[in-house]
């Protein structure tokens, strides 16, 4: 009895049967009214086919009105057992194969010579002969005296009838056996194969297939599943399929070729696509709950997956991975040595136990080399012990070119994506990838070695790729590694940082677009990214956040030879924002800065020049900033700096310069009148005891360069808890624009410090007044630079105590005694909550006087004015009145009158 059971079927109460994946009207289905359909539900339901409406609909007769959900089923093709049904089935089969022009050597010849009319006539003749034989026998018995010839004839007729009946039964049995041998197919489709009836069969496992010896080449066999009984246990792909025999020898690869002595079977690969299960790989439904604990029984997929990789490379087939966890614990590394296409699913997990590797700390889980094209997508790679490299790229075979990694996650390794060999990568793209919670770097790419030119690396692009992680809480740096001061984007001549989330060295044309670089507050991260010795490096639109390094000053990006950093989102960073070293002509454009607790917004080091900064809007963010002046004492600027600020509210005073006060070219300091100067921070020297200080606009200018053609620039320090201080230069004010104001609304400022250096001649006066809210003077004093130290060998300090109730502090300097030196390091400072605050007066010459009054909110307007070469135009300041408040006020009023009389102030 033959069966039809392709697809699934459901039945409604009215007897309508709906199929899924069925072809009920196919010429080979042999389904006709009267056939019985059995639903393999619980309980089993049965109905009788009334009409075949379409390939997916049958009208059936049912007496119970049962409703059956979609399930497995079987249609009993019992009509084939009758002579009429058999003839009709065979006729339909022959018409189908004739229309398909299929050659069926033995079967077609048999059916061509088979005369069904003769078969029917023969059956009728058998019946007539049998009846005639019985009559003849009765007549013979009644009249034995009849002629012997009649008896012989009757006996011959009886024998002929029996022979004809046996022949008919034999023919019917042969054809029915053909139908039954079709098995699950429930049709005679298998007869379309050239080997016809004698080569159709099944084998239960790949191991059994190796032992199945074919009669000849070209035979077909169906493999039920890779492992015996696997198909019944697993609803996932089970490695079954169709194989074709060959007589000869071939290498058994465990999935595509099954070889025996003198023969082998080759898998039929449809649509150039196969699965890892075709090579015997196994998955579990979910990963273990704790990635530090391995399950008691672990199936190692390393050898089988490597064989699948090799086939995908050699035949250009696509390798499909299943949902679930593939375990790997072999000492071998998975290797990709050519173009490959691997496609996983959202739930595909590679779980790696590196403990069996020879060097578990450094050996790679997967190695890619010589991949000239390809795509790897949707794989989640995990290590159970923060060891080894997740995916390593090298050039042991050749350069990697135009490889796309998409939705590839590499987590909890020592390094995530790792490139440690020069010139091994070309045109690699990372799309929506992730390197998370890795022990050292999530992304480590080094294509440059000391003493070599740049490698031949072509563009490496990162699109919406996340690189972040917490790492083990017990992380500690080894003695062989070097840590650096954590800074936001740091560029250095030579650096060997660890703990950063991404490391790039010696690359050209790199783009990191979108995505995220984040440390998630891990105490082990020195920076989010280190970029060194790179050419044309762009970071655009990337979320940079949550860095909290070994100290309070985390580093977001450390960069060298960076080309552009654009439209980045900077959040919750503790440390310097951007540090640049040895990077001529780099570009920073339009990052989004949010709550970055930075030591300095931009820090320039080591031969950095001709840079451009544009589009910054850090107004809200900068109030969280803390500036640090320490820097790295060994680094010096060796090139002339030519910054260019383009429509940016972040200016040069947000830039920290390390030990380079003589290297700044002020002629191109500001190029845009709308630029804003924010937080200029110099490094400290050994003789400067205070770590946080501000430079005024005059800090970088000679007397002739003070205004420098710009109109309005700002300097801000949001060093909490102080209210913001702004230093700005207004070029075209109608009266003396020099007002220097420091708010003391909360009585926070307790002291004013004044400092001088050495090698000055002549004398001058610093004037300090403490004013109340109405402007009345509460206390005044002046100080001679010479009085700090008569020989000027070192710098010195004088303190002015701010009285209670002072709301404003007014500063000024008067050249009183032919002062011809430069006050290169004179500071005036507000001192609040033990946080020092410095304003530096710089490049004051004998023909220059300055006067300023502090007004809220910490705004300083410093305008240059010249009183001429005759110093007598400056009022003299008698020493006897140095501590006399009335005398000081008298001199100040005289100074103001002199300035107004000479046209330097309006009335």
From Swiss-Prot:
GO terms for cellular component: virus tail, fiber. Residues 137-169 are annotated as: Disordered. The N-terminus contains an extended triple helical bundle. The central part is a beta-helical domain, which forms a negatively charged cavity at the interface between neighboring monomers. This cavity may contain the active site. The C-terminus is formed by 3 four-stranded beta-sandwich folds. It comes from Klebsiella phage RAD2 (Bacteriophage RAD2). Its main location: virion. Constitutes the tail fiber, which functions as a receptor binding protein (RBP) and mediates the attachment to the host capsular exopolysaccharides. Displays a depolymerase activity that specifically degrades the K2-type polysaccharides of Klebsiella pneumoniae, which allows the phage to reach the host cell membrane and bind the entry receptor. SUPFAM superfamilies: Pectin lyase-like. This is Depolymerase, capsule K2-specific.
